From Swiss-Prot:
UniProt cross-references to InterPro entries, sorted A to Z: Isoprenoid_synthase_dom_sf (IPR008949), Terpene_cyclase-like_1_C (IPR034741), Terpene_cyclase_plant_C1 (IPR044814), Terpene_synth_N (IPR001906), Terpene_synth_N_sf (IPR036965), Terpene_synthase-like (IPR050148), Terpene_synthase_metal-bd (IPR005630), Terpenoid_cyclase/PrenylTrfase (IPR008930)
Residues the record lists as binding Mg(2+) 2: 333, 337
Annotated Mg(2+) 1 binding sites: 333, 337
Gene Ontology biological process terms, A to Z: diterpenoid biosynthetic process; green leaf volatile biosynthetic process; monoterpene biosynthetic process
Catalytic activity: (2E)-geranyl diphosphate = (E)-beta-ocimene + diphosphate
Sequence motif: DDXXD motif, positions: 333-337
EC number(s) on file: 4.2.3.106
CC cofactor: Mg(2+); Mn(2+)
Residues holding (2E)-geranyl diphosphate: 296, 333, 337, 474, 477
Gene this protein is translated from: TPS1
Name of the protein described by the UniProt record: Trans-ocimene synthase, chloroplastic
UniProt keywords, alphabetically: Chloroplast, Lyase, Magnesium, Metal-binding, Plastid, Transit peptide
Pathway: Secondary metabolite biosynthesis; terpenoid biosynthesis
Main location: plastid
Amino acid sequence: MSLIIQSLPHWSRIPPRPPQLSQFQNSSRPKPLIQAGQVQHNALQIARRSANYHPSIWDPQYIESLKSPYGDECFGTRLEKLKFEAKRLLEATIEPLSWLELVDSIQRLGVAYHFEDEIKEGLDGVYGVGAHAGDDLYTAALQFRLLRQHGYGVTPDIFNKFLEKERTFKACTSLDAKGLLSLYEASHTMIHGEEVLEDAKEFSVKHLNYLMGNLQNNLREQVQHALEMPLHWRMPRLEAKHYIDVNGRSDERNMVLLELARLDFNFVQSKHQEELKEVSRWWRDLGLAKKLGFSRDRLVENYLWAVGIAPEPKFSNCRKGLTKLISILTVIDDIYDVYGSLDELELFTEAVKRWDIEALETLPEYMKICYLALFNFVHEVSYDTLKDYGWNILPFIREEWERLCMSYLVEAEWFGNGNKPALDEYLRNGWISVGGPVAMVHAYFLQGRPIRKDSINFLDHGSELIYWSSVATRLNDDLGTSKAEMKRGDVPKAVECYMIQTGESYEDAREHIQGLVRDCWKKMNEECLKCCLPKSYVETVLNMVRTAQCIYQHGDGIGTSTGVTQDRVISLICEPVPSQWP
């Protein structure tokens, strides 16, 4: 075990959740929803903190004006024809390397969900061949990465042919830029204990940087893009937009795939625009942003989160549900982090534990509308799941919200008492307070698949995949927000906890936390090879981390959502890709 991983919490099990859902199957309907307007308000004056969050940068009229022509039937007909042609191309490509490159392009272009069966059948055949991946580094690394990403138990022994007796990479590979880039991308699918892949990452980074100045423009851009963030860590929808642009400028572009990717991107974007309009109306009608002006009004940015986590068209309900969840969660987070007194926060936490509408009368005025919004949302999700699948998930997701609010209260008590927790103690609480577990449990039920008992049991007893992805999300969040929160005097987050604990500088502390993120990815990669959850859901969990790395890559992309976050919203949701290239 590395020194880095020892800084993470040491338990291997997640704290227990409520009884298995089978005990609640086909039970009575949730309580009817209550209208927020029924609540009577009583003002309570208390000195309040403020984070001075800027208001929403998105004009509701602009959101309502979004209208893409790509949802029209004529484009749907063309899309189906292109899918058929691409499927024929997959079937007709016999040469192994050409087929692997085709699959890699299909994935990067964001259209692999159309060809899941064909890709699986082909990879089954590749895996059956064993370690015979060809004699060049590029092919071997590409094959290894694709198999790992799809959950095949391939080992790094495939790289032995490129090693000297001393287990170092042969000198001749140091000049193969294309092979080094492929090796670099493959190394990020590593799990703990795979030293050859650790060496591969260091070796490829060193020599790619050395070769950079002598590379042709197209390859140099690819290397720079990869070294900024590896493919395995990138938000898929954002990578698809980038890769469509790169292919549009390439002399080697495949016109069938390129047109398919362009049209599919714009078609899916048209669906995303309609969803954004729907949840924007819901948010305005809910009234939380207007009533609770101290909180972050980030509906559009929250929808970007949802697009990053579950981008495919079939997950429309999941995206809308996650946007609602994140929006309500953000307000509650700001109540605990900034606005509420400790006495008020204890009342709110107790009300969530009771989960009784009568608890409303124990709350101060401003908390009532927030409690009702949460109450109604959870009952809506529970009712829809019971109606469609016969499972009463209310006790299950209630428990997740209770754990979340309890973790918020712990952080509020740390702040109120001036406590500065050690990094281990902070992360034991922080993996919950980041909202990962509550979001991923909701996502499972919102994705519209028949609910499997074995998956329920897996979630119920604690998912290591959800745990490590939540730790990684927390660490990425803290890397992006630490400067602003330290300046504001908030409770110490991961970077500051490590600085206080060790006396290290801010830069060294950030480097350590980045190392923890890398270790989390190794654990997630390992869990992906052995967990029993549906593959599409596993990707959803990984996408939470990928989206967090996108949102917090250049700072607090939610607290301050101008700049990079605004540009990414426009790029992914508002502006279609060009219909033709020079």
